[in-house]
């Protein structure tokens, strides 16, 4: 079964670290995809955007793409899609 929550980012990005903590504090299963350490993750992230840029942090929840969402928006989509 495919992971429902994916977090694209880097270890050195403070916003990425915020989302990692957010998911862990809510006991949500997610996969972290480091776009600096793994070129496949970078390509996957680029393919989510028309401009093909590394727009991180990006979160996908059951296929819904969220670019640097607010906590309110993130909670809304988690409740709606999970």
Stretches found by the model and what they are:
Residues 35-54:
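Thioredoxin-like thiol-disulfide oxidoreductase module
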Residues 14, 40, 73:
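Short alpha-helical
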Residues 1-29:
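Local sequence-structure signature of Cys/Sec-based thiol-disulfide redox active-site neighborhoods
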Residues 17, 21, 43, 75-76:
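Alpha-helical elements of the RecA-like P-loop NTPase motor core of helicases
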Residues 14, 37, 66:
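Glycine-/small-residue-rich active-site loops that bind phosphorylated ligands and cofactors
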Residues 61-82:
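Non-catalytic, surface beta->alpha helical segment in thiol-disulfide oxidoreductase systems
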């Amino acid at each position: 079964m495919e992971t429902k929550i994916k977090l694209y980012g880097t270890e050195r990005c403070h916003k990425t670290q915020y989302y990692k903590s957010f998911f862990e504090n809510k006991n949500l299963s997610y996969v972290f995809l480091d776009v600096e350490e793994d070129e496949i993750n970078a390509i996957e992230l680029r393919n989510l955007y028309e401009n093909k840029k590394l727009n991180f942090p990006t979160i996908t929840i059951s296929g819904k793409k969220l670019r640097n969402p607010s906590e309110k928006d993130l909670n809304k989509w988690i409740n709606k899609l999970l």
